[in-house]
């Protein structure tokens, strides 16, 4: 009886034209706390696949506009997951060594700090000026797998503004930082420039 009742409320189904009430309730709850520029929810399996979906969205956005943009920019020492897209944008080769020859086209930049912010901005702007960058993916404020390497919101905000000026999709990987772990609902809220896409997973399930 319990299984039958559950099946009537929570269908195990791909959301391609289908949905169910628990998913609708969760989507509405998320929309109530996400930054105001977030308008859509896309459900995936886990943190790694949420990153893959975000990268595909960014690449398809430019494809649909007729722009030949296929490069992704990510931070050095970042970690975004174990699926191929997520590994491509991760910077820790200890996890990715055997697969690196098959990755997406990714350019990695240093994490900005007080000492290098100007040089990082110059490098970032130079890369974006080539007009082949589709997206910039980052872990806001802290790189968890890199031994909790922190960076300041003011420096990240400067990069996000530069990306916006070049029509680059900003992707915040908040799989680790989301849902109050940094003192706000989302680490992205410490910046004045909101990401175009936010990836969530941990603490959601």
What are the residue ranges of the model-derived segments?
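Conserved N-terminal phosphate-binding loop of PLP-dependent enzymes in the Aspartate aminotransferase
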Residues: 1-205
């Amino acid at each position: 009886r319990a299984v039958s009742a559950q099946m009537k409320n929570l269908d195990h189904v791909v959301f391609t034209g289908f949905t169910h009430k628990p998913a609708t309730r969760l989507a509405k709850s998320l929309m109530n706390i996400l930054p105001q520029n977030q308008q859509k929810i896309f459900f995936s399996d886990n943190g790694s696949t949420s990153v893959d979906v975000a990268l595909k969205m960014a690449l398809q956005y430019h494809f649909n506009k007729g722009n030949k943009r296929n490069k992704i920019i990510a931070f050095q020492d970042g970690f975004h997951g174990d699926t191929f897209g997520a590994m491509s944008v991760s910077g820790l080769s200890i996890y990715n060594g055997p697969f690196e020859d098959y990755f997406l086209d990714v350019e990695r930049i240093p994490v900005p700090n007080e000492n290098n912010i100007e040089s990082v901005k110059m490098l970032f702007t130079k890369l974006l000026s080539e007009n082949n960058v589709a997206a910039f993916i980052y872990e806001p404020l802290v790189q968890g797998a890199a031994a909790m390497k922190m960076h300041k919101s003011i420096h990240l905000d400067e990069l996000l503004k530069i990306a916006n000026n070049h029509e680059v999709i900003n992707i915040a990987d908040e799989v680790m930082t989301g849902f109050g772990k940094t003192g706000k609902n989302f680490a992205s809220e410490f910046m004045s420039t909101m990401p175009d896409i936010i990836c969530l997973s941990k603490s959601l399930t």
